[in-house]
């Protein structure tokens, strides 16, 4: 085997080149590491040995014929042959002739806000990581020592930045690269800022709704970005003290794809239009969703039995996109248990929403005061008078259900087991009713009577007996409750523009006399004791009604202590013309 020989002149040349490269690798600062470029074409080649502090470009540029911006970038590399290294917090003083071209190269080891200041007006263009995508940084307000055209990047990611400068006039130029935002000394930046983040889990659909309060500082110019981080045993939580760290962690998860569009990774995050829902990539642990001025976001494709940490950042549009951390929260994305209902308590529950079905649970007490077979009584009052159905479940098996009802209704559940837990599922009777079926009032009791609620009759209809020009007589079935009881008749005036009783029926309002008078469109009210009649029929005449008007009438049963319960609402339509006082209509 022959050993290859090398000429002495070639060995000296290689030794000189290696010593120059080694000297270039050593010369760097902690905040910004620079590599001396011997030739402009070296920018387009990947180095053989990567610098651990500065990541190389992760995107392979597209061919020049397919990407005009890359073609222009390569042309600028040839035209701007005068190269100068730029370091963070180290000013550069140079003298430039008119129309002289200068190229600055800045390498960042860490993501940070970046401000580049010029002492004189110059033309400038900035590129990130040799991708050929020109950045569009915001301008810095001119001031002492800061000329018009200075640049600010709210978040400069790790990597190489090429800054091409064209002098407009002859003279001295000072260039400063500062690792801070020009608004970093804003007095409110470190002020106490308490904002609540609320979440709603939909584990079956792998969805989560995130809502938050608006910013207390300059809310009219504040935009929001939500950072979602999935936590696991393999990937512990990363603490983001600023928005740049979150963007850096997000971009490190995936290589940048070649693109001819202007702007860097941060502009791609901010530039995405706000959407009502956003699908998360389950292969990534960090996600960033910017919502603009919207203060809620629907997230999809979450992983069950996982924990998520939410960081909310504000983007101040009036201060050059200054970012500040507003709030944080941690959520366990597990199946939530149904809300447990309490006995002898009238509770208002939500039954609407995108699901259309809501489930609540209740437990039969271990010991009951009943002598015979144990049972449970349910009082159900649809708030808006919409038709709903109820199903009773035990261990996922249906043990009872009701027909559609729209007024106060009692259900007697027999054959219950003491100590067992049951589920109560509400759902609208049809798709049309789903628009109005939003809330329902529920009361449970294992006794024959509700302690603080009056008993309503089986038929809760209120009848319109007779209507005259300015009066109406109504009747209803008396309560079977033997306790001391009274009735209140409450009249609301329906507005002329909309006389639909559907829009104004509300069985869940506070019918306490002192409070019901505060409601809108309240017209008249009277309360009296029950009447003694053989058929247990109660009647009342309502006076001073206006011809041509429409009224919504409620009758409530009231105990001396406790909450009143309403009968079914009645609508009165008064005739618009009345020839004499004897004119009347019967129903």
Curated annotation (Swiss-Prot):
Cellular compartments annotated: Secreted; Secreted, Extracellular space, Extracellular matrix
In Pfam terms, one family for this protein is NDNF_C
List the GO biological process terms.
cell proliferation involved in imaginal disc-derived wing morphogenesis; extracellular matrix organization; extracellular regulation of signal transduction; imaginal disc-derived wing vein morphogenesis; negative regulation of BMP signaling pathway; negative regulation of canonical Wnt signaling pathway; positive regulation of BMP signaling pathway
GO CC annotations? extracellular matrix; extracellular space
Q: What is its main location?
A: secreted
Whether Transferase counts among this entry's keywords is no
Per the UniProt entry, the signal peptide is 1-24
Task of the protein: Secretory protein that acts as a feedback regulator of dpp/BMP, wg and hh signaling pathways. In the developing wing, is a dosage-dependent modulator of dpp/BMP signaling involved in wing growth and crossvein patterning; low levels promote and high levels inhibit dpp/BMP signaling. In the early pupal wing, inhibits dpp/BMP signaling activity to prevent the formation of ectopic crossveins in the posterior compartment. Binds to dpp and gbb to modulate their release and activity decreasing dpp/BMP signaling in the responding cells.
Protein name as annotated: Protein NDNF
**Which source organism?**
Drosophila melanogaster (Fruit fly)
From the UniProt record, report the name of the gene that encodes this protein: nord
């Amino acid at each position: 085997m022959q050993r290859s020989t090398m000429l002495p002149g070639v060995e000296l040349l290689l030794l000189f080149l290696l010593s120059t490269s080694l000297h270039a690798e050593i010369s760097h600062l902690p905040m910004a590491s620079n590599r001396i470029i011997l030739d402009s074409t070296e920018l387009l080649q990947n180095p053989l040995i990567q610098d651990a502090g500065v990541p190389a470009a992760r995107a392979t540029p597209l061919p020049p014929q397919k990407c005009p911006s890359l073609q222009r970038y390569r042309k600028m590399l040839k035209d701007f042959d005068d190269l100068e290294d730029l370091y963070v917090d180290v000013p550069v003083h140079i003298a430039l002739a008119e129309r002289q071209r200068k190229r600055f190269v800045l390498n960042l080891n860490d993501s940070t806000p970046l401000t580049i200041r010029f002492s004189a007006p110059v033309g400038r263009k900035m590129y990130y990581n040799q991708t050929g995508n020109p950045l569009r940084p915001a301008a810095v307000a001119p001031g002492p020592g800061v000329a018009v055209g200075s640049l600010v990047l709210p978040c400069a990611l790790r990597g190489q930045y090429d800054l091409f400068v064209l002098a407009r006039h002859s003279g001295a130029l000072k260039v400063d690269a500062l690792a801070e935002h020009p608004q970093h000394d804003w007095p409110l930046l470190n002020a106490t800022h308490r904002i609540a983040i609320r979440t709603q889990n939909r584990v079956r659909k792998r969805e989560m709704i995130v809502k938050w309060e608006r910013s207390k500082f300059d809310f009219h110019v504040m935009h929001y970005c939500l950072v979602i981080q999935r936590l696991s045993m393999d990937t512990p939580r990363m603490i983001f003290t600023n928005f740049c760290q979150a963007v850096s962690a997000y971009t490190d998860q995936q290589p940048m794809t070649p693109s001819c569009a202007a702007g860097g990774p941060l502009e791609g995050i901010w530039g995405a239009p706000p959407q009502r829902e956003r699908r998360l990539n389950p292969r990534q642990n960090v996600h960033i969703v910017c919502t603009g001025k919207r203060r809620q976001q629907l997230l999809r494709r979450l992983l069950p039995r996982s924990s998520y940490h939410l960081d909310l950042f504000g983007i101040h549009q009036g201060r050059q996109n200054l970012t500040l951390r507003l709030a944080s929260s941690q959520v366990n994305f597990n199946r939530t248990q149904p809300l447990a209902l309490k006995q002898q308590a009238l509770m208002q529950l939500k039954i609407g929403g995108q699901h259309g079905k809501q489930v609540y649970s209740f437990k039969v007490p271990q010991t009951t005061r009943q002598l015979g077979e144990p049972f449970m009584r349910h009082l159900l009052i649809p708030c808006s008078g919409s038709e709903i159905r109820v199903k009773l479940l035990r261990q996922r098996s249906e043990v009872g259900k009701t027909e559609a009802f729209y007024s106060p209704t009692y259900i007697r559940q027999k054959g219950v087991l003491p100590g067992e837990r049951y589920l109560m599922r509400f759902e609208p009777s049809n798709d049309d009713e789903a628009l109005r079926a939003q809330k329902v009032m529920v009361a449970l009791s294992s006794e024959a009577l509700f302690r603080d609620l009056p008993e309503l009759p089986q038929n809760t209809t209120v009848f319109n007996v007779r209507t005259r020009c300015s009066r109406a007589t109504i009747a209803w079935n008396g309560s079977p409750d033997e306790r001391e009881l009274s009735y209140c008749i409450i009249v609301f005036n329906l507005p002329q523009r909309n006389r639909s009783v559907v829009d104004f029926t509300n069985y869940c309002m506070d019918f306490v006399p002192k409070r019901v008078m505060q409601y809108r469109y309240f017209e008249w009210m009277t309360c009296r004791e029950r009447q003694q009649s053989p058929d247990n029929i109660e009647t009342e005449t309502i006076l001073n009604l206006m011809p041509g008007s429409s009224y919504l009438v409620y009758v409530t049963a009231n105990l001396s202590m406790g909450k009143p319960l309403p009968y079914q609402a009645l609508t009165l339509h008064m005739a618009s013309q009345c020839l004499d006082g004897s004119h009347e209509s019967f129903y």
